Structure formats: structure tokens, C-alpha cells
Amino acid sequence: MACPWKFLFKTKFHQYAMNGEKDINNNVEKAPCATSSPVTQDDLQYHNLSKQQNESPQPLVETGKKSPESLVKLDATPLSSPRHVRIKNWGSGMTFQDTLHHKAKGILTCRSKSCLGSIMTPKSLTRGPRDKPTPPDELLPQAIEFVNQYYGSFKEAKIEEHLARVEAVTKEIETTGTYQLTGDELIFATKQAWRNAPRCIGRIQWSNLQVFDARSCSTAREMFEHICRHVRYSTNNGNIRSAITVFPQRSDGKHDFRVWNAQLIRYAGYQMPDGSIRGDPANVEFTQLCIDLGWKPKYGRFDVVPLVLQANGRDPELFEIPPDLVLEVAMEHPKYEWFRELELKWYALPAVANMLLEVGGLEFPGCPFNGWYMGTEIGVRDFCDVQRYNILEEVGRRMGLETHKLASLWKDQAVVEINIAVLHSFQKQNVTIMDHHSAAESFMKYMQNEYRSRGGCPADWIWLVPPMSGSITPVFHQEMLNYVLSPFYYYQVEAWKTHVWQDEKRRPKRREIPLKVLVKAVLFACMLMRKTMASRVRVTILFATETGKSEALAWDLGALFSCAFNPKVVCMDKYRLSCLEEERLLLVVTSTFGNGDCPGNGEKLKKSLFMLKELNNKFRYAVFGLGSSMYPRFCAFAHDIDQKLSHLGASQLTPMGEGDELSGQEDAFRSWAVQTFKAACETFDVRGKQHIQIPKLYTSNVTWDPHHYRLVQDSQPLDLSKALSSMHAKNVFTMRLKSRQNLQSPTSSRATILVELSCEDGQGLNYLPGEHLGVCPGNQPALVQGILERVVDGPTPHQTVRLEALDESGSYWVSDKRLPPCSLSQALTYFLDITTPPTQLLLQKLAQVATEEPERQRLEALCQPSEYSKWKFTNSPTFLEVLEEFPSLRVSAGFLLSQLPILKPRFYSISSSRDHTPTEIHLTVAVVTYHTRDGQGPLHHGVCSTWLNSLKPQDPVPCFVRNASGFHLPEDPSHPCILIGPGTGIAPFRSFWQQRLHDSQHKGVRGGRMTLVFGCRRPDEDHIYQEEMLEMAQKGVLHAVHTAYSRLPGKPKVYVQDILRQQLASEVLRVLHKEPGHLYVCGDVRMARDVAHTLKQLVAAKLKLNEEQVEDYFFQLKSQKRYHEDIFGAVFPYEAKKDRVAVQPSSLEMSAL
């Protein structure tokens, strides 16, 4: 074969004479008209034409008519440049002219109607296996082109050597069908391939690549030795050096040398029996392959997988990497000491091992190479990707961020700190690493150099923009052109998917299923499931919720019923009432809001359901209500639903269930759910009902296992507001006590305090008159100290600890998310409820830690409903009193942190107007104290009221605002109002009159007639806000003030309902019937019942309505949101015998226990 001179040199594109514009690349003057960034259609047409010309090389040397010396002229600088694509930096305004793309090889994945630029491994960047050598006629042009490229890289032309090399390569291909690169050519090719890598941000170092030529090795053992040398050289005690080891080139595709690992060093990922993954999830498949090949797994989080090496096409061999070669960096944070507790680490050497080097038509499928890490590769991708180690939420939680709220930007804060930790850890151990900002800056410098030196720089914007910081890095604003040049590093198909095994016994068990088969199997399974579900009884599960608790339980119920039924979970506001006629089984899970009202998303269904008169379809139903026995109408909305469905003729499947927030709510739900499920199976005659396996959630036992929990020391400082925000899923903020004043007379045996809270910046305060403030209180120090003195085997009270629990498989420890890292003292003070009587479930667990048999038996007896109810209502014991009653209890810190219930916020009506006091919130609080055992027992104190009464000025108060949309002032201020509130029931009305005063003085808005009805014992004892009321009356804000005194000496008791009956009957009728007025009631439940009863009597008498008509009349008033009730209170054990729904008469405190 003669030397193919036509492939030796190609024509270079002629420049077109242009004047005016400065060319960034070579400073040639351009025409002023060529300034637009977009590529025109003419540009594209010319580019296609020039590409065709480029791919059809023209002969540069005619048969012997020109001497070789004349070829030297071809290297001279041309007079003009070829057409270009303009690349602009939108940050700096600088532009580049890309001409290098004319030398691009192949076609990228983009299509005319779709862009595939974000595909991870597109076909255009992937080389598959071969089953025969590259044909010489395909290989020769590529080889000559590479030789030209190689000799063109010299500053001075070496014409004779160049021609001789072309001749030698030609003859070698003609003789052997392939050719071998010289050592210098190999070095040039590997560096040039790095230079051409469009997805690499660190190419500024391309010329410093160390090349190890391992083309002479023939066995896997030799490959391993070369790799060990490579790792040792590159690691360099932390001063990382970039290097590449090149194994023999591909011949016929049947004798490849390949490294099966994706990277030389990588961590194993283990698929655990419970479905969880231990280690790096990205490596689960490869780890299983290693195990199948004989590797013994260690099941750690950071186990280095062995090298799997294939030599000369033979079956792969496993080699453990010597531990002394693997430099690892333990992660720590410069500020957060707890970061060490995450026990994170990462290897220092990022060595890619599974790519293919293409150069001059030759392919090297084994060529591991490395640079050094950019911090975000570890800190963002390896640690934070959800499909990798996924530590983001754990770090955010430990930082005390609002991980439940995306808008808090907790992810952004956490990922920054993780990356700070990575950079700090590497730098502290003197291991090479580069931050992403420096990397982006270096790439911009490299890119500018490349455009000036060779007129282009292939770059993949999607890969080069770092995974964090986005537009604050310069590469974000840089337009880029992506194309493939030769030499190039290509992706490869995983070796184990294409390898032809010589020893079938060593072949790993095939787990893959062909895509067609898999798709058919999935479709078939879906079809079967649809048929199965269609044949099952349909169940509709409705929920209404304010906080999300009912929704969560509804989905849990759906999971249970999916074992034998076809369930559908629907929010009440999405449910069409007409569907009731098609139901067979309806389940309802709902909470009760306020004074027996339904949650907001249940209002629509409630209105339409309660107006329904009859139902033709007599379906089965069951209802579960959630609430707190502290509220006056416990689970009232659920009871209303239950009764209405029954009146419509539906059949109750099981008795209505109740879940008390203060007494084992979830246990009650699980018990009701299982009972309902079993009843449904019986009723609908479900086949195989005896063998149905229900979810583990419903079968958990009540045993206490101390080995299931452990405490780990933690140094993270507690941010109380952030911790409470996370626990209660609320935006908890901190206010400070400005002042506290006792509103009752010094001679009174009781106390009602005005608590004024303030904050520096009132912008965060956003509330309307009538809304509530949730206060997160602290327990009494005496109770906390008493419990601490009885804890066994616990840490010091002020040592910060973190509770960890074994995962379900019992394989490893996970942080318990119920509590933040804190000291035991902090937990007992701010997070755990130590005043509510223990539930029956907690008593069962306490029985297991009693060391005296009589006490254990007594605790077990108390778990029986009758005994428990008597003991609870008689003693109402705090947790400390339980420990004192049963002194043999050996309670550990782990027991307390894992088993005690969470301390709930307490809610108070706000007694101030934001417009009137912009940086303050006022509360009206009755300080609660009472004796248990019918007044003969120990003195108990209300948790929050006592805590507020003990604060000093400027002490912090964690709190949050809760909306009370049903208790706002009328939208039209001209509408008349009647306000009824005895005792602290006056709290929200103070905010009303302050708002009306502000509107009058600053907006010129005169409100409608506002009548106040207040009640207390005596004017000289507990007539709170008396002077303010008189002032508001004088200023015309309150048009009438009526006070009912119930303890005046020598006079009969007068209550607010008496005032209504005796003095305001006409006013009530005028406001409610003749005008679109509003009536507000705030106070304890018995007062509210008496007031409602009195009002109904008055209206019935005046309008001559019967009982049913008057009930409907007031139902309409509530529906129109003209009759408002805000009724809260706490159940007191000593009043339970008198009234099962007893409340503290004048406290708006959510709980006094």
C-alpha cells in the first residue's frame, strides 16, 4: 500500500475578509455587522457545507510534482479565519469565536425537535464492545489524522520525521491490520484526550498528566501491580498528582483489558434483607457482583470494594486493595462538633477506571486515570444526593433547621455546611482538594486560553456548572459549545453485561431481566392487581385535618385495609356527596377544631351532609375522632358525623373510636383500626381472613427493650426555637417577657395575669384580633429535679446527648427524630410531658422496670380500664408522683427520652391588636392551681400559666400564632356586635376594642354598636380590665358594658346568661335577626352551654319557633359565621364526677395539667 498522501494534510478553511470588530481569539479585525451572538441560518448552512468539505479530504500533494519542502508552507498562518459560532459570556459580555468545532467527530444526541443534552451517558459518548478488529480502510485515515495532529503540536515542523512516521504507520496497518503508538504519541494522546473532555472542569492541568505505559502487561496480576503503583504515585501522602495508566489496546474485541470497577477506590453498597441499603447505594449492583465472585462482605458503611480486573479477555479476578494504599479523610466541621458523630469519611483519590481512550482509531478499554476532588463532588453529590448517602436531612435536623418547611431553605443551609466540612477536613489533613468557586474560575481562565490557542473549547454546560452556587459561579453565565474531538475518553457499557464467560461456574447469578420481559411482567402484574383490587370490596376513607395528623392516620388505615380491600383515601373537601349512594364501606378519620367545629377542609362536606334528609344506599360505616380531652366538646365533629350517618340509615360497623391527644391517641387508633378491619372482614366475608398478614405498624408489642436504644454524646448547642419548630411543625419564634401584672385584687386567693411579650422587630408578628398564641412552656424545676434524682445509669443532667435506636433489622443505629440533641435536663424541661398522668401503655412498660414484685403487679393491675380510670381521676399523678408511688422503678435516661410523651404547646387568645402595639403580644392568663384527690391531695400547678407567672423580664418565650378564622371581627365594621366573656373569656375582646380604637383614631372608621357582657365574682376582687372598659365606653368604642357579679354579699348570684335574659333580650334579637350582626362567646364550656341555651330560649320566644326550628336557626347563624364561639378549658379530675366535660372556668389555657 503506497503512502496515502491525500490523508496526510487537509485544506484549511480560508478566511473571509472582514473589518471592524475585534476578534477575541486572534485579534483579526472583523466587520462591524458580525456582532450578533445567535448563529444565523446562513451560518448553519455554511457550517454543514464546510463539515462536508472537511470530511472529504482534498489531496495536497500531486504525484511527485511538488517537493516535500513545499509542504512547510502549509503550516504558515493563513490570511483569513473560517466561519465561526459566536459564544458569549452574559456576565462579562466577552465573546469567543469558536472554529474548533469544525474538527468535531461524530454526531451528538441532539435532535431537531428535542435536546438530549442532560442524558447521563448518551450513545454518542459511549463505545460498546467489538467482536472483530477495526477494518484497515477505516483505521488508516484516523491514524494519519492523529499523526498529523501529533506532529502539528510541535512549535517547529519536523517534516522528515513526520513523513517517515506516516509511512511507517501505513505499512504497519497494511501488514498487521493495526498499529502501535510510540511512547511519546501515547503521552500526547492521553493529555489531548483530557484537554478535549467537555465534562471536566479541571482541564487547566491537562499538560501535567503523568502517564504510566502498561501496554506490555499480560495478566490480571500485572494489572493489579500497575494499579497499585498508580495509586501510590497519585496519592502521594495527600499531595494528589494526576496520572493515567494505559493497558493494552483493543485488538479484536475478544481480548480486552478492562477494570470492571467504576473507580479504582469506591465504597460498597449492601442490599439488606429489609430493603434498606447499607453503604453507598450507587454500588449495590457492583458489590453484589463482587460477592458472587467470592468477595466476603463486611457490611460497613465505608468498605472499599476489591478491584475486579480482566486481562486479555479472560474471566475477571478479584484483588483486595492494600489498606495502606487507600488514603481516607474523616469528616469534621470547624464549628459543629457533632459532625464527627456522623462518622463520615471519604477516600482522597478520585480515579475513574471504566472509560475508554480513543486515539487515531485505536481503542484502549483499560485506562484508569485520576485528578483530584472538587469539594462539591463529595459534599453535594456523594453525601447529599437522595440516591447516595443522603445525609442532608440528618444534618439539617442536627443544625436545628426547619426541615419540614421547604421555604425555610434548610437544604441550602445544610448543604453549605456539609461542603464546609468536606473542605475543612481535607485541608486539615493536607489532602489536595479544590472548592467549586476556584474550580470555576480556573476553567474560565483555561477556556480563554483555549480559544486563543486553538480557536475553541468543547464544553458541556450541564456538567460544568457546579451542583451548588449556580449563578454565583462564572461558568453559569458562559455560553458553551459541546462537541467531540479526537483523542477522546468515552463511556463504556458495564463489563459484566457484555463479558463472555469462559468458566460458566464463575458466572454470577443473572438477576437482570430483559426489558421486554420486565415490561410484560409489570403490565401483567398490574393487570392482575387491577383485577384483584376490582374484585375486592371498595372502601372509601375520608379525613379532615388541621395539622395533618388525621391525614397521616387515614393513610395508615388505607395501608391496613389494602391487605384485603380496595381502599381509596380522600380529603373531605374533595369528596362528592352523591358518591354516598355508591358506597359499601365508608371510614371517617377526623379531628375536632375549636368548640366542636370541623377542620377547615371538612366544612364543605359537613354543610352538605347535614342538610341531607335521606339516603337510599344503606352502607356500612365507622368513624374515628381525634381530639384532646382538654377541649370542651371532645371529638364533637366525629360524633356529629357518626350520629348523622346513623340517622340517614347507614349501619355502624364498629363503635366510634376516640383518640385523646393526652392519653395514648395512636394506641387507641391502632386498636380501633384493627377491630374495624376484622369486623369488615367478617361482614364482607373476605376469603382467607384468618391468614391475612397485617402491617407491622398494627402488631407492635408493648415491651420495653433497653438494648434497642442508646445515648450518644453530642456537642451541638440547643436552638430551642428551631427544635420546637421541628417538633411541632410550626414556625416557632422567640418573644421576651416585657412585663407581667396581676389583674386581680391583692386580697384575692386567685391570680389572673396580663402578660406582655415583645420582640425587637415586629415584622414577624402577623396576626388578627381574636387569634391564638401557642406558647411552648417549660416544666417546673422542682419536678424536673425530682425526676433527675431518680434516673439510673444516666449521663450528667447537663451533658448534651442524642437518642439513637436500632433500625427495624437490628443491624445499625439511627438517630431518633422525636427529640433534638439536648441534655436530659433540657428534655425534661422543654420537650417531655411530665405532668400528664401516664397512659396505660406507659404503665405497662413501667411495670417491666419495677424491681419489686408487688409494685410490678400493682402497675399491671392499673393497666386494666376500670382500675386505671379510677386511679387517674382520683390521683391525676405527675410522673414524679408515679416514681414516688412506686419507688422500685429503675428508670433510665433512654427510657425517659423514648417513652415519655411530648410536651404540647398551650394556646391563649391574644389580648392585643397588632396595629395598636406593633411589636407586642398581650395575653390574659388565669394562673391555675388545684389539689387532687377531691381537694385533699397534693397541690398541682398549671404548666404554662405557672411558667409564665415565674418568668423574669426579658426571659425568652417560644411561641407561634395559630389562626382562628372563625373568631374575627366582622368584615364590615358597621355591623353590630355583642361580646360575651366572663373571667379570662374577655381576652380576645380586649384585642377587639383595641383594634376598633386604632381604626377610629388612625383610619377614621367608626365601628358599629359593640355591646360587652362581662362576668366575675366581685367588682373589688376580680373585675379585670375595669378601667379599660370604662375608657372604651367613654371613647365610644364600647357602646354598652354590662357586668354580672356572682359573689356580691347579700345578693343573688348573677351570671352573663342572666344579663342576656333580663336586660338584653331585645338587643339580641335586633343584632341576630333584624340586622346582620354578630354574637361572640368566649369562656368555659358550661358557661357557653348556658349562654347558648338562654339565647335559644329568647329567640324561640320572640320568633315563636319550636325546638327543631330554633336549632336550625342557630345552625344557620353558625354557617353564616355570625355566631362565634371560642371555648377552651382543661379537664380537672376532681370535677370529673360532676361533669365529664369539666373545665377551668376562666382559663383559655389549653392544658393546666
From Swiss-Prot:
Keywords: Calcium, Calmodulin-binding, Cytoplasm, FAD, Flavoprotein, FMN, Heme, Iron, Metal-binding, NADP, Oxidoreductase, Phosphoprotein, Ubl conjugation, Zinc. The modification Phosphotyrosine is found at Y575. PROSITE patterns: FAD_FR, FLAVODOXIN_LIKE, NOS. The modification Phosphoserine is found at S234, S578, S892. Residues 539-677 form the Flavodoxin-like domain. Induction: By endotoxins and cytokines. Induced by IFNG/IFN-gamma acting synergistically with bacterial lipopolysaccharides (LPS), TNF or IL1B/interleukin-1 beta. Down-regulated by zinc due to inhibition of NF-kappa-B transactivation activity. By oxidatively-modified low-densitity lipoprotein (LDL(ox)). Polyubiquitinated; mediated by SPSB1, SPSB2 and SPSB4, leading to proteasomal degradation. FAD binds at H772, R906, Y908, S909, T924, A926, Y930, V943, C944, S945. Its EC number is 1.14.13.39. One of its GO terms (cellular component) is plasma membrane. Residues 730-970 form the FAD-binding FR-type domain. Belongs to the NOS family. This is Nitric oxide synthase, inducible. It comes from Homo sapiens (Human). The gene is NOS2.
